[in-house]
Amino acid sequence: MKWYFKQIKIYQMEIYIKVLAISILTFCGSEIYAQKLIDINQAKKIAIANNQKIRVANLEVLKQKASINKAFDLGNTQISGELGQFNSAFFDTGLGISQSFSMPQVYKRKKSVYEHQMKTAESYLKLSETNLNQRLDEIFLEYNYLNAKQSLLRRQDSLYANYLEKSLIRWQTGESDVLEKTSAEQQRINLSRQLSLTSKMMNLVEVEFNWLLNDEKQQYAIQSDAFGIKSYSILLDSTRILRHPELVMADWEIQTARAVTLAEKSGLLPGFSAGYKNVSFRGLGPDEIVYSGTDRFSSFQVGVQLPIFRKAIHASIKSAQLQEEIQSQNYLAKKEELKTNLAQKTLIYNELMTQLDEFENRSLPNAQKIRNVSEIKFSAGEINYLDFVVLINQAINIENEYLD
């Protein structure tokens, strides 16, 4: 959070340009609607329903679900016809039909691949929803922080406005020099610039907020809540790592790779074919009977398809096994990354909680005491204005550091 205010002079112009550009694009791409105030839960529901990435992920799930029936593809049925002297010197006709098929486990394994791909797509959808909800949480946190910063700056501005008024009176009556008046004016100028910057940053956050919600008929405003961080401790629960959407998705990718390996091994199984043929016969038959063209005879065919040349099949199996190993290593790497990330954030969080307790128990009361005593001494003429400004700025810095 300190980034917004530690380098104001460097980034102020860049921020103004970004806000202006995004605002212009937003204005040009949609009509103007009255903003509707919503809370975080309402925002998540709207975003899940409208966000483009979520829509794409949903379509991917539907696509994979529709692909499951592809597993039972038997291939084309072959229908053939014969005309000519294929039985004797006479002209005969023949009709045939045949179908190739695999063993039942081949189709079962193919179905398993498509089902696992659907589960992987569902886990990606869940991950996308989680990332979207997390970004919305961050946006609300950022907005509430900026809102709290704005309130603090306004209180400080009100304080310096009062002191500027007193400084002008003191300068006009000859009780102070121009340095005191100029210093008071500059304090208000600085606060005005920070207030303007904070307002622009809040606008920028709302632009991204509405982009995530992707509602073409309504613009939304963020409902401000009390700014705080202690309620986020549940995010640091280490027992939830294995249920993290990224790990769940990585696990389904492993299972999908295993299913693909089994499906590739099905190439080593024999295939089968069955057929039926009906032909005519004319002339003297082997049974000493003379047949006309209207007499027809039937036969059945059964075949076995053996994978004699297996080099390509074994190569496909090896490739699938390597992909399985790749996904397993990806899972372990992602797990370690999440554990390390959680450990780092836990250390940072615990340190920040310690600092917050110190601020609330000691620094903030001290800041209030510094402010109260400084005001009394300044009003009584016991300290000059510059000493007063130093003390007040010290109290303000404590409040800013606590908020940051």
Describe the role of every protein-language-model region.
Residues 124, 207-217, 263, 268, ...:
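Long amphipathic alpha-helical coiled-coil segments
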Residues 3, 10, 131-245, 345-348, ...:
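Periplasmic alpha-helical coiled-coil/stalk elements that build and connect Gram-negative outer-membrane
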